């Protein structure tokens, strides 16, 4: 879910004085259960040859792929209109702006 949040929701916005507009989680957009797709987790064991017991970190793996996959899917859908979104998060406002810029 962290990667989906990065791709579609999470953004630090600041006012003209440089103060954050969202200073609590009540104001900061994060995906919740209503926005969560069904996720099926598969495990594949690939021990690291560089550590004593083959262990590796796991925290980053779920956050790295989703923004790229979602971005590619959105841009694939926009391709026929000559539009592209190249900034995260991918919001409806940014998609509409990309379509307008492309003259679609």
Which residue stretches match the model-derived regions?
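C-terminal catalytic domains of large/alpha subunits in multi-subunit enzymes
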Residues: 1-104
């Amino acid at each position: 879910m962290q990667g989906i949040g990065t791709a579609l929701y999470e953004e630090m916005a600041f006012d003209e004085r440089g103060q954050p507009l969202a200073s609590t989680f009540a104001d900061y957009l994060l995906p919740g259960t209503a926005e969560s797709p069904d996720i099926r987790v598969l495990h594949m064991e690939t021990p690291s040859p560089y550590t004593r017991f083959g262990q590796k970190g796991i925290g980053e793996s779920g956050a790295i792929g989703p923004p790229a996959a979602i971005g590619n899917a959105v841009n694939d859908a926009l391709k026929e209109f000559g539009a592209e979104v190249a900034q995260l998060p991918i919001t409806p406002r940014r998609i509409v702006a990309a379509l307008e810029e492309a003259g679609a």
